[in-house]
Every structure is written in structure tokens, then in C-alpha cells.
Amino acid sequence: MKRINLPRIHKLYIQGTEEKAPVVLQTIHLCNTTNAVIKAINITNLKIHLTTKALKHLYDSKPAEEYEFILHHLVSIIKYPDEIYENKDSKRGDFAFVKTIKDSKYLASLETTKIALPDGLIEEMNFVVTAFRVRKLNYLQNYKLLWNWKGDIPSS
């Protein structure tokens, strides 16, 4: 499978756009998740997608250094998370994928949605809707841990 190059996607669709400006809507196959993650969060489709709209949101709302870091590490955060939490109802997305990279925690929110196909079948699709560096030590304190990489089970 061809490896996704988010910096290239950024250059093609996002770079140089004005804040809040619309972008050409593209859905990008970001990566496939692992079987362990599929079982842990009970999803049926291993493919994880990202839209240019979500990427534009990150570009408009994150500091440049953080956005650049996310461009280069989003696949790793989603494909190999250290922990997965159930996202809060007040937050966008169903799951919070968390990974520690260079002594900082990063969170990517994954939303699972059902899409009607032209043949009438329904397909589950998974989208990254946002990502950011977790700045507050207690940010995840009230989130429910669903899975962690170390034990392949939630810790108590």
C-alpha cells in the first residue's frame, strides 16, 4: 500500500489558503488500523480517513509548530496509539486516540459514521476529525479508558 504523504496533501490543498476559506473537499485514506484496535473499539472497517476540510480546520486553529508536527505524526498516532478513550459527548468524534511522542501526548479524535453506498448498502467509515497536543496533565482524567497498547486491555 502506498504510504500517505500528509505534507504533500497540505501543499496541494491547504497551503496558502486564507483563514476559514473553503478548500477542495477530498477524502484521503490515511491508514489502516490494527486488528487489536478494531477489537478494542468494536469497529468493522479498518480503514481510517481524513478529509481536506478536517486538515484545513487543523491548519486554521493550531499553532504552526503543532500543525507541522501533526502532519508528520498523525498516521502514527492513529495506527499505533498508546491508549484509546471513549470521547465525551460534548466533543466531536467517538474515540480519542492518544500517543506520547517526544515527551508530549497527542490526541486524535476518530468519528465513526455510516455512509449509504449507491447500491443501497451501508458502509461504516472512520474519520479523523481533529488532533492536538494535550497541554493539561489532567485533560484525560475524566475520560473512560477503553484500551491501552501495553496490556491490550483497559488498565484499572
What spans do the regions from the language model cover?
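Ribonuclease/tRNase effector modules and their secretory precursors
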Residues: M1-S156
